[in-house]
């Protein structure tokens, strides 16, 4: 189990940062270094844990039932946490084993989690990336970005218990609670174009008519968490995210992946408010406010005709705020 150790931190309560042009750009970095993961853990939260001997199908249904996106995996034989089961696993299973709407996906119906892990990882078992509650939030952000993961279990080193799952979204929301107390860094007033935050080359997208199975292949190949859905002119009309895929389990429609992404997205049409977008000329402050208020994981960057130009994710934002002080990532 690969855990991030705690650093010795300054006082953890509200800091009095010196307001100088030099220090302003690192004000969020200082904040993250002076707060521990423990500070972010709510007094009450839902945590679902799966034993690796559980059937894969039951595990995914349990994710849906409990309204969570991932769960730590407990290996009874090793008496330790060995990994995470996420929607990405569901996508990988469907993509690997789906044949046609007429053939049942035996591996999804019958495999245990441990069987799937053996097949999928094929002896390339990586230790579970986790973090101590006493480690700084700066360490947590660094670990999320360095390991290219979206969920970081907070595990008590003494008891071995999982206390919470840290995500980019939860960390940014926590930072936003205190953001008005700090002097505003200069880069917050700069535009996306000036800061070059986000991804603007080789954007993975799908058409409205793209079959779900093809979309799953793009998720697997490009390792992205969402795909803008575009019309024939390249204008964004919808977005198909990994989280939408778990609905196939909720509706038990995972045996027919030949339907279009448009049809697969009909389940949420009654409350879907449209794709959340932004423009290159908008400031970083505006972008952060939009992301936090809408509680989404990314914004689609478009031009004045709604043609997709790029994607800005929570990971991009945290990297800019905390690790690079508004500078373009190396």
Curated annotation (Swiss-Prot):
Record-linked CDD domains: CBS_euAMPK_gamma-like_repeat1, CBS_euAMPK_gamma-like_repeat2
Function: AMP/ATP-binding subunit of AMP-activated protein kinase (AMPK), an energy sensor protein kinase that plays a key role in regulating cellular energy metabolism. In response to reduction of intracellular ATP levels, AMPK activates energy-producing pathways and inhibits energy-consuming processes: inhibits protein, carbohydrate and lipid biosynthesis, as well as cell growth and proliferation. AMPK acts via direct phosphorylation of metabolic enzymes, and by longer-term effects via phosphorylation of transcription regulators.
Protein name: 5'-AMP-activated protein kinase subunit gamma-1
Lipid biosynthesis listed as a keyword: yes
Residues bound to ATP 2: 69, 151, 169, 241-244, 268, 276, 297-298
SUPFAM superfamilies for the chain: CBS-domain pair (SSF54631)
Annotated positions binding AMP 2: 69, 169, 241-244, 268, 276, 297-298
Domain CBS: from-to ranges: 42-102, 124-186, 197-259, 271-328
Binding site for AMP 1: 84-89, 129, 150-151
Family classification: Belongs to the 5'-AMP-activated protein kinase gamma subunit family.
Biological processes, Gene Ontology terms: cellular response to nutrient levels; fatty acid biosynthetic process; import into nucleus
GO annotation, cellular component aspect: cytosol; nucleoplasm; nucleotide-activated protein kinase complex; nucleus
Positions of region (Disordered): 1-21
Subunit-structure text: AMPK is a heterotrimer of an alpha catalytic subunit (PRKAA1 or PRKAA2), a beta (PRKAB1 or PRKAB2) and a gamma non-catalytic subunits (PRKAG1, PRKAG2 or PRKAG3). Interacts with FNIP1 and FNIP2.
Positions that bind ADP 1: 84-89, 129, 150-151
Binding locations of ATP 1: 69, 84-89, 129, 150-151
Sequence positions that bind AMP 3: 150, 199, 204, 225-226, 297, 313-316
GO function term, MF aspect, one: ATP binding
